[in-house]
């Protein structure tokens, strides 16, 4: 889950919650407290539900995850979210510009503050806190210091302190990542290559694969495609690293295939390629959904 808008978050969470259930509330020093509730009975009140989050999940996506978790409606899987939950008011200035003032913070239904703490003069600490969410030992220390709350249906313990902490923690798979591949990404070489490559290959791929299913089952980027990518890297000053490339080759092929699928069949096709192979959290979510009575429902009990 990425970021998003408040209205969409309320609508999405409301799909799974009963009428009147608090989805999110706001409170500020000079702003009256207010709550946003589900306006109708959700269309899916009892179905199996898993919400995926990670360090990039922010704002509206945290509202959805927090509401689902606090009402014990579904299982939250992945890694701690970013922690971005501020209400801002825009004030127009005479020269046509504007300034945004933070006036309140978002709270989950159990009362947890979504926004990570940001104390005056501690900007560096704020960003270090985000980095710690990638580190096992540091994350454990954050959890130990986090205030405890109770969910609203079964009374399970959940933790505040900023962001949403998943019910089931699944670490990122970094086995296929190398410094060499990271350098290709950081310099924009992969993005530039993909655009040129797909511009020249789209028609032939479309003729060969009429459906996503056929593409997914039959297509793998060739060695020649990978050689063109590394050659572009060389021309941009990224020296070829055979060892690093060997580590990242499966990841590179999968990423290129997913991007080709996106160009041919839409954004959803990208995730249909990338998630099963590259996301341990996605695989865990599927396993939970398939064995809900043993792997999902018990998580929601006290």
Model-inferred region functions:
Residues 2-3, 13-23, 27, 53-57, ...:
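Sec/Tat-exported extracytoplasmic proteins
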Residues 113-114, 118-302:
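Conserved functional hotspot residues or short segments at active or partner-binding sites
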């Amino acid at each position: 889950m990425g970021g998003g808008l408040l209205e969409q978050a309320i609508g999405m969470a409301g799909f799974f919650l009963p009428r009147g259930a608090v989805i999110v509330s706001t409170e500020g020093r000079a702003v009256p407290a207010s709550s946003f509730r589900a306006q109708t009975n959700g269309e899916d009140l009892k179905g199996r539900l898993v919400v995926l989050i990670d360090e990039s999940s922010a704002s509206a996506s945290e509202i959805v995850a927090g509401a689902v978790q606090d009402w014990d409606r579904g299982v939250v899987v992945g890694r701690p979210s970013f922690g971005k939950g501020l209400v801002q008011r825009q004030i127009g200035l005479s020269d046509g510009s504007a300034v945004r003032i933070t006036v309140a913070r978002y709270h989950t239904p159990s009362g947890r503050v979504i926004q990570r703490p940001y104390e005056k003069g501690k900007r560096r600490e704020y960003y270090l806190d985000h980095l710690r969410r990638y580190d096992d030992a540091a994350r454990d220390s954050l959890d130990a210091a986090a205030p405890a709350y109770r969910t609203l249906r079964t009374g399970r313990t959940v933790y505040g302190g900023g962001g949403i902490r998943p019910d089931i923690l699944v670490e990122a798979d970094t086995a296929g990542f190398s410094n060499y591949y990271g350098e290709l990404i950081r310099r924009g070489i992969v993005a530039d290559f993909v655009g040129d490559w797909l511009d020249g290959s789209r028609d032939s791929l479309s003729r060969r694969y009429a459906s996503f299913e056929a593409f997914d089952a039959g297509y793998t980027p060739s060695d020649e495609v990978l050689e063109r990518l590394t050659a572009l890297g060389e021309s941009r000053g990224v020296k070829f690293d055979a060892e690093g490339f060997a580590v990242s080759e499966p990841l590179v092929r999968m990423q290129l295939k997913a991007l080709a699928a996106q160009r041919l069949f839409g954004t959803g096709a990208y995730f249909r390629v990338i998630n099963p192979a590259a996301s341990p959290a996605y695989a865990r979510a599927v396993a939970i959904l398939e064995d809900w009575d043993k792997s999902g429902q018990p998580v929601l009990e006290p």
